[in-house]
Amino acid sequence: MDSSKITFEYETAYELLVRLGADGLFLHTSLPTLNKVLELVPGKCYELDGDIGSGKTQLCYSLAAKLLLTKKTAKIGWISAVPLRTDHLSQHISSTDADETSHLLDRIVCKRVEMVSELRDSLNALCETINMQLVIVENIDAILHDTAYDREMGRNVQIDISERLRKLTRSGITVMVTNHITYWRGYPAPALGNFWASQIENRFFVERRSEESNVRSVSTMRGGNEKTIRVDFEISDGGLKAVV
């Protein structure tokens, strides 16, 4: 055999597992192209960072809908300062049966919180909920906004909350947090400051490509010398769409 004619094709660990039929080890959205970037592993904590209207919540809707459709007993915790828009989430569920959709939504445990103490109580309660597999904390900067201004007390609160998030992951629960971004010297950075940013290793940046376009993108920066990986998507009445 002429070894000079042997060719190799690079693939990530995620692509290898998918090729071997083990993609059930990951959490998915409705778009395979997004899943290749996110590579969401159960029992980890992730954060989506982006401006208002960038598509962070829509990504969470898609993730939640996919889990409800594929894991028949799984429960999802949804923590937010505003009520969950079940009508918007339902657009990501492919079923046209209203009763089936209602049954799926019944497996979402909603916690409306505005104060840190309520966030603590909600995280504790969800950690003890049977069959809880995913916890989404929407706009955590709205709940922890004061911690960005009080350096000592704020850091203690952020440590406490991040430890409670890790407690969820140690129980095998996946955590997805959404956070707004601020701009420092023209560069985007997660809200709540550098210390909070250091508490969550797995981050994704979600952005709208332009004001005139419905195209969004989600990207991640890998460690070391690896380049940023980005994929585009659109938001439609039926959920997320791939950009061809």
UniProtKB/Swiss-Prot annotation:
At the top level, the lineage of the source is Eukaryota
Give the subcellular location. Answer: Nucleus
**Gene Ontology biological process terms from the UniProt entry:** DNA recombinase assembly; DNA strand invasion; double-strand break repair via homologous recombination; reciprocal meiotic recombination; resolution of meiotic recombination intermediates; telomere maintenance
Q: InterPro entries in the record, alphabetically?
A: HRR_RAD51_Paralog, P-loop_NTPase, RecA_ATP-bd
Query: Which keywords are on file for this protein?
Result: DNA recombination, DNA-binding, Meiosis, Nucleus
User: Any one cellular component term from GO for this entry?
Assistant: microtubule organizing center
Q: Name one GO molecular function term.
A: single-stranded DNA binding
**Role this protein plays:** Has a role in the homologous recombination repair (HRR) of genomic DNA during meiosis. Required for rad-51 recruitment onto ssDNA gaps generated at stalled replication fork barriers.
What does the annotation say about its assembly with partners?
A: Interacts with brc-2 and rad-51.
Which protein, by its recorded name, is this?
A: RAD51-like protein 1
Q: Where does this protein come from, organism-wise?
A: Caenorhabditis briggsae
